[in-house]
Amino acid sequence: MKMRSFQTRAFDIKDQNKVMRVVVAALQDLGFIIERANGPMGLVTAGKFGPNGNGFVEVTVVVRAKGKEQTEVRVNALFNTKPVEDPKAYQNFFIAVERSLFVTQG
């Protein structure tokens, strides 16, 4: 449960498609290559090589409506098939998402 708390964030935006576009842009800004993006399912998968080319980082992001006024984003990250448990990795992702949302709203 603790890990889920830093993997999930709700945004006060009801436009799920907009949040999907922002998630894709944020991942690309962080150096990820988008492998799959399925808008109707709210699913994005991406990957990139780890620091100094060591290992591989895979992320799966799920975007879904939360009530009538919010959209929830949940990200799961794996490094060489092991779950990433460092909250900072998830914080960096959500900072990039928030930055992109701010730019698109401004």
Regions found by a protein language model. Give the residues of each.
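Ser/Thr-rich, low-complexity intrinsically disordered terminal regions
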Residues: 1-106
